[in-house]
Amino acid sequence: IADYDKHPAGQNVTIAVMSYEGYNMQDSIIFNKGSIDRGLARSTYFRTYTVEELRYSGGLVDEICIPDKEVKGYRSEKDYKYLEDDGIVYTGATVKIDDVIIGKTSPPRFLGELEEFSIAADMRRESSAVIKQGEEGKIDMTILTESEEGNKLVQVKTRDHRIPEI
């Protein structure tokens, strides 16, 4: 999407390596705090989360939606707070660790679970896409499309501005 091979992203910074007040020049690089405050070395990190509604044998399918409380593995309501009625997060939402961005429920992993306990076929488990550990940001873009097999495919792109630590 960004064509980094044609339009590279980055900054060219000229530095002078010399001793500073008698300290060894291999210890560190000293930056002016004002240059960091004005945007030097800032970057934007993008991550794309992809969820597909898969079809399984026996006519069972995944479903992109807000999971019900009866679903096995249901999280707390606050984890689903950014989802709209279609089970997908809205563009511009500020998300953090463990927030659900694409709600999804799946049939039981093994058909033996249904037969063994004589449970109805509507028993489902939670398999939503959540923000990974150590990440946060804003929802930049949402794409709804179909996979090559004709399954519904949802992609959510997050954007995080990263500032160097001083």
What are these regions (language model features)?
Residues 1-166:
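Intrinsically disordered, low-complexity regulatory segments
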